[in-house]
């Protein structure tokens, strides 16, 4: 190879360093300044039941936290089924590889990003009760989402009932 080819190869290598540099993604924004956004997070149990999927749910709530101002987000609604099974001690690997406790912790960890920043409403679903299939009303939701958890709830929380025993 002659000098010209070496110089060309060097320039291309240096140039790729600058071309592949990551930039912060373009933030979504509202077209009407008077508008606001409400975010819906449906059925996250598919994210919490496998350890490999848990970071995906955390990315969703991170995106919400990072978009509060640009999208004028006023609240988040999660439609329930935070976990696949409320009281599973030994996962079968097919319907998840996380115990119920690990699933509840993953859901709680994802929502921590919104605590103190944004009010959110989490509805419990049938997967959040009982041992496997909502055969009783036992639910670990109050253990991971106590009423005192998010200071943004103070203006909107009306009542909290005890867990059915």
Give, region by region, the residue ranges found by the protein language model.
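Residue-level recognition of hydrophobic positions within alpha-helical transmembrane segments
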Residues: 11, 77-80, 124
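N-terminal active-site segment of His-dependent metallophosphoesterases
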Residues: 21-100
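Positively charged n-region of N-terminal signal peptides that target proteins for export
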Residues: 1-5
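Short, structurally constrained coil/turn elements
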Residues: 15, 32, 69, 114-116
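Bacterial N-terminal signal peptides
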Residues: 9-16
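Extended active-site neighborhood of metal-dependent phosphoesterases/phosphodiesterases
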Residues: 88-165
């Amino acid at each position: 190879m002659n000098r010209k080819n070496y110089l060309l190869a060097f320039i291309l290598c240096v140039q790729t360093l600058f071309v592949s540099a990551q930039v912060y993604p373009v933030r979504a924004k509202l077209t009407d300044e008077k508008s606001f956004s409400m975010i819906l997070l449906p059925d996250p149990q598919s994210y919490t039941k496998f350890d490999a999927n848990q970071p995906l749910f955390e990315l969703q709530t991170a995106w919400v936290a990072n978009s509060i101002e640009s999208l004028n987000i006023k609240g988040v609604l999660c439609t329930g089924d935070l976990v696949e099974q409320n009281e599973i001690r030994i996962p079968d690997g097919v319907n998840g590889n996380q115990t119920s406790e690990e699933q509840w912790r993953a859901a709680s960890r994802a929502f921590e990003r919104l605590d103190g920043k944004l009010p959110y409403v989490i509805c419990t679903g049938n997967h959040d009760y009982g041992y496997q299939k909502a055969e009783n009303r036992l639910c670990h939701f109050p253990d991971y989402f106590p009423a005192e958890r998010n200071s943004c709830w103070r203006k909107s929380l009306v009542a909290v009932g005890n867990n059915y025993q």
